[in-house]
């Protein structure tokens, strides 16, 4: 994740390396002239490893069952440690920031099928920071820590996406979600 990147992440809650697009050239052994397209890969929901601000994180109360469902269905556990990842609704404000910070050419959406059985779900379209509406990613970690998500609700599709191979085969509700993400970012 971009928010763990040493340069563009939510310092001090970052890793010691570059996990953004620039890391492919500086740490991946790929010459910068060999990069002609930048793909941004993201999940239909948000996750975070370790500490740090996470405005859309599911709470331990009313959302604990939803968190556990997404964690189990999406297999959101650390590969080496087995620790459960922090999960929450897709943060479109953070995704738009990631696109800008990394000059993303195209997005690749994964884990859409995790939502197959839900009646509805939400995505963050802005924040409220100390009572003020904020539609951009905050420059300060303190503002991000104080951010409350402004959520938009989407209808679920209640059908398996397992056999879907083409965009047009997606249920209308899934296409609506994808279209909203495309327009927002």
Q: Positions of the model-derived regions?
A:
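Non-transmembrane, aqueous-exposed alpha-helical and coiled segments at domain scale
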Residues: 1-185
């Amino acid at each position: 994740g971009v928010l763990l990147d040493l340069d563009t992440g939510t310092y001090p809650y970052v890793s010691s390396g570059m996990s953004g697009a620039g890391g492919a050239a500086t740490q991946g052994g790929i010459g910068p002239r060999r990069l002609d397209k930048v793909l941004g890969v993201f999940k239909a929901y948000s996750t975070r490893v370790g500490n740090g601000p996470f405005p859309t994180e599911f709470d331990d109360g009313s959302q604990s069952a939803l968190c556990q469902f997404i964690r189990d269905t999406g297999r959101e556990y650390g590969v080496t440690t087995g620790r459960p990842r922090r999960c929450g609704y897709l943060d479109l404000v953070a995704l738009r920031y990631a696109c800008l910070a990394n000059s993303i050419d195209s997005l690749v959406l994964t884990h859409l099928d995790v939502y197959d059985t839900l009646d509805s779900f939400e995505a963050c379209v802005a924040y409220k920071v100390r009572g003020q509406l904020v539609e951009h990613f905050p420059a300060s970690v303190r503002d991000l820590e104080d951010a409350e998500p402004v959520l938009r609700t989407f209808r679920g599709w209640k059908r398996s996406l397992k056999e879907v191979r083409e965009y047009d085969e997606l249920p209308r509700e899934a296409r609506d979600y994808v279209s909203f993400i495309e327009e927002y970012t």
